[in-house]
């Protein structure tokens, strides 16, 4: 065996293999690895951007919810205030109406009392006139006079 041919033959074959690999095989592998590395980096960056956007969207949603709750609270407060105003207004109107009805009833009662007094006065006057005319028609004597007055008192 020849040491030179045995040694140099595989060395030259290996060198040709390395040169061929470096020239034709390695550049596409490096390009594929670089592309893959770029895709992974882009994917990670997109994931981070997506996470930031998600966090931002969550904060905006929370802010919108807080604002909506505040607006709802304000609307409820305004509705409660309006309800209280309406109830108070209705109470005041009812009180005024009750006072008006009461005043009208008092006025009607006073009118009826006045009419009853007038009617009673007229009746008393009529009875007095009737009694006087009866007294004057009869003789004036004490017993007849007393009987006539008793009769008038019974009629009252």
Swiss-Prot record:
F(1)F(0) ATP synthase produces ATP from ADP in the presence of a proton or sodium gradient. F-type ATPases consist of two structural domains, F(1) containing the extramembraneous catalytic core and F(0) containing the membrane proton channel, linked together by a central stalk and a peripheral stalk. During catalysis, ATP synthesis in the catalytic domain of F(1) is coupled via a rotary mechanism of the central stalk subunits to proton translocation. Component of the F(0) channel, it forms part of the peripheral stalk, linking F(1) to F(0). Keywords: ATP synthesis, Cell inner membrane, Cell membrane, CF(0), Hydrogen ion transport, Ion transport, Membrane, Transmembrane, Transmembrane helix, Transport. One of its GO terms (molecular function) is proton-transporting ATPase activity, rotational mechanism. The keyword Cell inner membrane applies. The chain crosses the membrane at residues 4-26. One of its GO terms (cellular component) is plasma membrane. This is ATP synthase subunit b. InterPro entries: ATP_synth_B-like_membr_sf (IPR028987), ATP_synth_b/b'su_bac/chlpt (IPR002146), ATP_synth_F0_bsu_bac (IPR005864), ATP_synthase_B_chain (IPR050059). Its main location: membrane. It is a single-pass membrane protein. F-type ATPases have 2 components, F(1) - the catalytic core - and F(0) - the membrane proton channel. F(1) has five subunits: alpha(3), beta(3), gamma(1), delta(1), epsilon(1). F(0) has three main subunits: a(1), b(2) and c(10-14). The alpha and beta chains form an alternating ring which encloses part of the gamma chain. F(1) is attached to F(0) by a central stalk formed by the gamma and epsilon chains, while a peripheral stalk is formed by the delta and b chains.
């Amino acid at each position: 065996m020849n040491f030179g041919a045995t040694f140099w033959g595989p060395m030259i074959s290996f060198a040709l293999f390395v040169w061929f690999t470096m020239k034709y095989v390695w550049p596409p592998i490096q390009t594929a690895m670089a592309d893959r590395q770029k895709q992974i980096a882009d994917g990670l960056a997109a994931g981070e951007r997506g996470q930031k956007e998600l966090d931002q969207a969550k904060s905006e949603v929370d802010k919108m919810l807080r604002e909506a709750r505040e607006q709802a609270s304000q609307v409820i407060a305004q509705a409660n205030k309006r309800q209280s105003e309406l109830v108070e207004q209705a109470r005041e109107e009812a009180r005024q109406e009750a006072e008006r009805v009461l005043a009208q009833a008092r006025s009607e009662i006073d009118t009826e009392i006045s009419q009853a007094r007038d009617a009673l006065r007229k009746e008393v006057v009529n009875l007095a006139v009737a009694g006087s005319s009866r007294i004057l028609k009869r003789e004036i004597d004490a017993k007849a006079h007393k009987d006539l007055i008793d009769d008038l008192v019974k009629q009252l």
